[in-house]
A protein has these predicted regions:
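Carbohydrate-active catalytic/glycan-binding domains of CAZyme proteins
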Residues: 1-261
Length: 261
């Protein structure tokens, strides 16, 4: 079921035609939904909702300027909030007590060099077992570079700060099965222990599968053997949230030159 457009320029002061993109969400202790997004020329901003469908902008900027892009929020075991962000050549992070005021963590979480990529983006995390987490990431989609040629990898951590790259590739060139371009991966741990990875597939040549949002499935979170088109044409930057009702909602980005992201 489509719920339409939630946020678009001129929300948060974004200029018409510019991106308001990369949504990431979390359920707060009071049951509300907070959505963070990248606002072109402004930084990482946030909005809140009682039902996950109608959002009210929150004042201020969570992370200003060009310090961060493509955010992913994660609730730490101690209750604090962390935003993992893309900085082209590295993934960095910012931590907050209240989800509103963030302080940059020292160092980086993972570099593009360590991941074997020319540039890195879209960190997204799932807890694979108690005290062990896996981060998925992909090649950074650079404006003007054209579609195709993206691949997704992963890394693991026991403290959510230091990440070790998993051997091989999950999706894209070099992966054992699903070798089409794949970007902006987002993992969902299903009740049976399988991992569903949602991602954007945009081909460099016409024909074949349609462009848009796909879902791949893996028994171990490392080898993905099956994929299916979600029907969301040209959808990208997915975030899947389980609402307090138990339903799941997919937030994703789109772009219209007359409007923006």
């Amino acid at each position: 079921t489509s719920h339409g457009v939630f946020l678009e320029p001129p929300a948060f002061g974004v200029v018409i035609g510019e991106p308001l993109a990369d949504p990431t969400t979390a359920v707060l202790d009071d049951g509300r939904i907070r959505l963070y997004a990248y606002a072109q020329g402004i930084g990482i901003v946030s909005a809140v909702s009682d039902n996950g469908l109608t959002f009210t902008e929150e004042p201020g900027v969570r992370i200003p300027g060009i310090e961060a892009g493509q955010p992913r929020v994660w609730r730490l075991p101690d209750g604090r909030w962390r935003l993992y962000v893309s900085k082209m050549m590295e993934i960095a992070s910012f931590t907050s007590e209240d989800g509103l005021i963030f302080t940059k963590d020292s160092g980086n979480r993972l570099t593009a060099e360590a991941a074997g990529l020319p540039a890195i983006s879209s960190p997204a995390i799932v807890e694979v077992e108690s005290g062990r987490w896996r981060m998925y990431y992909s090649t950074l989609a650079i404006p003007g570079a054209g579609p195709g040629g993206k691949r997704s990898g992963s890394a693991t951590s026991t403290d959510l700060l230091t990440w070790t790259v998993d051997p091989g590739w999950r999706l894209g060139e070099g992966a054992p099965y699903l070798t089409d371009s794949a970007e902006h991966p987002f993992p969902v741990l299903d009740e049976d222990g399988t991992v569903s990875l949602f991602y954007g597939k945009f081909r460099a040549s016409p024909g074949g599968a349609p462009d848009g949002l796909y879902r791949a499935i893996s028994a171990d979170g490392l080898t993905f053997t099956e994929e299916a088109y979600t029907g969301l044409y040209f959808g990208n930057d997915p975030e899947v949230l389980r609402l307090p009702t138990g339903n799941r909602i997919v937030y994703y980005g789109d772009f219209d030159p007359a409007i923006g992201g």
